[in-house]
Amino acid sequence: MEVVKSPMQELQQAKEPFDTMSPLLLKSLVEEPKKRTEVPNHLLESRVYAKLLNNKVIQARPGIVHFGGYEIESKHQQILNIANISDEDTHLHILPPQTKYFQINFEKKEHRLIPGLSLTVTITFSPDEWRYYYDCIRIHCKGDDTLLVPIHAYPVLNNLDFPTFINLSDVFLGESKSYVIPLQCSCPVDFEFHITLLRSHQAFTIEPKSGIIPANGKAKVTVKFTPIQYGMAQIKIQLWISQFNSQPYECVFTGTCYPNMALPLEEFKRLNTRSKKVNVPLEKTTYVQFYPAPAKAKPQKLKEIDYQDLRFPADLSNPFAVATVLNQEPGKLKIKELKQVLDQGDEISKTRQMKEAIFEQKVRQDILTEIENHLKWQVHLGKEHTTYRFKRELTEEWKKARAKYKQNRGDPVEGEELQRLQTEQSQKRIVRDLKGKRQEFHPNFDPLVNNVWLTRHRAQRRFQQAARKIMLERRLLSMLGAIRGMDKESILRKIIQVNGKLIQGENPSRGRRAHLKQEDNIWRYSLESEEVLHFAFPTDSESYNELALDGLGLVPIKSPEIQIKHSYPYFTLKVPQLYKIKGYHPFSVNKSSTNYRLQKLARPLKHGAEDEVTTIITIPKKDTTPLSAKPSILSMKPPEGLAMSVEYDPLYIFNPSPGLFAVKHPLTYAETLIDYHLCSHPKYKYTQESHMGSSIPLTQRQFLHHTDIIPGIMNWKKFQPLVFSSMSDPSMVEATQRSDWYSSVMLPIDVPAPLEDLPEEDRLETTERDLCDQGIEVMLTPEMVQVEFPMLIHRDSKKEKDFKDSTQLPEKVGERVQEEMKNLRSKALNTYLILD
């Protein structure tokens, strides 16, 4: 009976011939599929994504995504929120990362993003090796607003336990105590570290201050405390690790060393026996010389080896150093060195290699700018023309470089060669240009170099200041001597005599003046010894009675429960009424309505018979004043306010409420008045310059609108009083008080006699003023008008002949006067000064 084979066995037998076939033959029979080219993204190629964190429309939270620390062949996720911070709805186009290690996932519920809401994006990171990863998410909004969200992934130290405070206490003087800080790495990547001291101390030593933490290994940092004196010492260190987006670790070490700390009994006895004094003769004492221990030589730091523009570290035993050498390119600077070169301002001190790096960076920047412009499909307008300032700076830079090149080459400097006083030998060949003109040097002789007039003038000025200071000091000393030599008894005696005369009823001023004339002594007061009382201090009463009213002292009294209400009187507020103060009378409105009459009549009044009215012609009276032979055109009258006093406001003398309003003094000869040109007191700086055809000066407004300040008018505040300058220390000297306020030093002895009547000059002036107030008119004279209007002096010869003619008629004289008035008004600057 045959055994039926199972289907699995049949499949296994069928696969056997295929397994025995060569794989190369199978690959040759199968055609490889063609890789399709990726479709270019229009938003990725036509937009520039440079803004971080946020733009005008959206905001990324967080702005930069970090994957700090990861595990290979595992997935890590982080959340990114994109919020709408604008006032309108917006549409978003999120471009995913370009590498396969980062993937994004988000759920877009609506087609637009409402203001205030956010879109949640999940970022998944899948690493395959230990290295640094970088990518970004690009977001395009409505319009041309873009946003860039960078993504960083990097290995970190996971098991780093760095303390923040360590206390090394109770350390003996001369001994040491150490503390070891382990730096452990859990990933197969080397990390560099270095330690900086924020606060240092001599008693602490740290080894090593820099090094490498090996991959999946451990490095130790030892902090040793060796006190050199009693007290407390403290340092603060900072640990930096060469990993991306790392923060420094800080730690504070404190060490103490106190005297007389607890010692063992045997050590205490040993120190006690050594401290006992032993009486040994001086000649038997031995001199022991203590040599200091040789200082430990610090190991020299191995320098890097430069070979064919490559730098090889001295220690190549770790993979970090090997990777550093393999990643180098000949002639390429590091990022740190390139930043230092770009930060320097003076390009003369840079080497040729640094200048080439800067030039290559500028070319690279121009290429990137052209690429961005090509993506924008815009016409490149080119650069601006070279400015004059840039040309001048470039020329000065070339001159400096040429001067430095000549200095390094050893060329002689012309200015220094002309000032050289001795001959110098040079081994260098000097080449001169025969075509150029030789500069001739002509010496100059100055005979006024040795003139000592300025020094002599300065010494004389200082001598004058010193002499003035000595004179003031001597004058002050004489005044102080006179004050100290006052006779106080005579002063008091004269005071008593004057008081006695006042009691008798005499005139104090006449009696005092007569008394001063009789006696030669200058003091006017006196005091007798009987009137001086002794000093008395308050003393307690000897007889103290306990039963007296005040024997028990203050006795507390219970306050009454009755509440007393205080009445506050209120006074009526009285406001000053101006119409009563100025003398105005009240006006009745009712009477004005009944007594008011219109200026124009409603209808014309009736007249009598016009035919019966006889016309009466009145002959005008002729003026009986005889006319002079020479006609006068000076018929103007001065204004009436010239001889009148200024009118004051009634509130100017007594103002009951000055806080409400203030009445100022009226301006005399204000500029708004017509008689301002007759001002007798100028309010401005007078100069000889004036207008053409007038005597009014040009500077009449400088006083009213001046902004300058008289220099030196407040210099007296800078000087110290003479009394304080003569003393050594004004704060330590007691201030003296004046004993006599009416001494002859301050007040004169001979005073003028009292006046019984006005002096003769004042009396004549008052009489003249009274005459002016009576209404006497002041007439202008031809001399006054000639001074004010100098153009009237120059007259035509023809007009002079007409004035000399005495046969003119009165009508022609009036016409001449009117013509002269018109001519005068046309030539004057202020036409309103000439009256009709």
UniProtKB/Swiss-Prot annotation:
Tissue specificity statement from the Swiss-Prot or TrEMBL entry: Expressed in testis, specifically in developing spermatocytes and spermatids but not in immature spermatogonia. Expressed in the ciliated respiratory epithelial cells lining the sinuses, trachea and bronchi (at protein level).
Phenotype upon gene inactivation: Mice lacking Pcdp1 have several phenotypes associated with primary ciliary diskinesia, including hydrocephalus, male infertility and respiratory abnormalities. Hydrocephalus is observed on the B6 background but not on the 129 background. Male infertility is observed on both backgrounds and is due to an absence of mature spermatozoa in the seminiferous tubules.
Cellular component, GO, one term: axoneme
Pfam families: HYDIN_VesB_CFA65-like_Ig (PF22544), Ig_CFAP65_4th (PF24507)
Single Gene Ontology MF annotation: calmodulin binding
GO BP: any one term: establishment of localization in cell
Alphabetized UniProt keyword annotations: Calmodulin-binding, Cell projection, Cilium, Cilium biogenesis/degradation, Cytoplasm, Cytoskeleton
Keyword Ribosomal protein recorded: no
Main localization, broad class: cytoplasm
Region listing for Interaction with calmodulin, in residue ranges: 466-500
Highest taxon of the lineage: Eukaryota
Cellular localization per UniProt: Cytoplasm, Cytoskeleton, Cilium axoneme; Cytoplasm; Cytoplasm, Cytoskeleton
Family named by the database record: Belongs to the PCDP1 family.
Quaternary context: Interacts with calmodulin; calcium-dependent.
Function, in words: May play a role in cilium morphogenesis.
PANTHER family assigned to the protein according to its UniProt record, in alphabetical order: CILIA- AND FLAGELLA-ASSOCIATED PROTEIN 221
Protein's recorded name: Cilia- and flagella-associated protein 221
Organism: Mus musculus
